[in-house]
């Protein structure tokens, strides 16, 4: 029941784990009138419902409920599930192709970088929180924090410091 939504290249995506723990990816669009069936991320979800007319889909993308279904004489629910997107889970990441029917060849795409990604052990990590900060501040100071890693061994010693070098910096020469 863990799920997340995102927009990638203009395609609204819903990724969700089914009962077996397998990741599924779909276009986050109701097949009736095109409203999004999910927002944000979370866990424990067993179904997703369109906020407009209430069409309901399960974690495998199958259409499970249509309010006043008798008004849709002969509708085949099998043909009106969420549109499935190709998805691969590897190295602790989920890779979705927003333009089916292409299947992602992650090994070929990553090439030698796959060894580096595997060494991070990202599959052992889990999402902690998402924050959006709307504040009046000097964006250059924020960017500088992400371009220098000197602070990692102190500020992030129990999270990312063990997997990153804390004595490197990136400067643009200005």
For the regions a language model picked out, list residue spans one by one:
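Rieske [2Fe-2S] iron-sulfur-binding domain
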Residues: 2-100, 104-115
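C-terminal catalytic domain of Rieske-type non-heme iron oxygenases
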Residues: 88, 93-174
């Amino acid at each position: 029941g863990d799920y997340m939504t995102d927009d990638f290249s203009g395609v609204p995506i819903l990724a969700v784990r089914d009962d077996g723990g397998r990741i599924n990816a779909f276009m986050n669009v109701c097949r009736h009138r095109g409203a999004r069936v999910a927002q944000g991320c979370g866990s424990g979800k067993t179904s997703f419902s369109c906020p407009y007319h209430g069409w309901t889909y399960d974690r495998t993308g199958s259409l499970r409920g249509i309010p006043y279904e008798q008004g849709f004489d002969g509708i085949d629910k099998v043909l009106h599930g969420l549109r499935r997107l190709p998805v691969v889970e590897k190295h602790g990441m989920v890779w979705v192709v927003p333009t089916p029917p292409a299947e992602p060849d992650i090994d070929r795409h990553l090439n030698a970088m796959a060894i580096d990604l595997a060494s991070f052990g990202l599959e052992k990590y889990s999402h902690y929180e998402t924050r959006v900060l709307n504040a009046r501040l000097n964006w250059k100071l924020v960017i500088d924090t992400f371009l220098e890693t000197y602070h990692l061994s102190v500020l992030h010693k129990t999270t990312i410091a063990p997997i990153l070098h804390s004595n490197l910096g990136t400067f643009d020469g200005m």
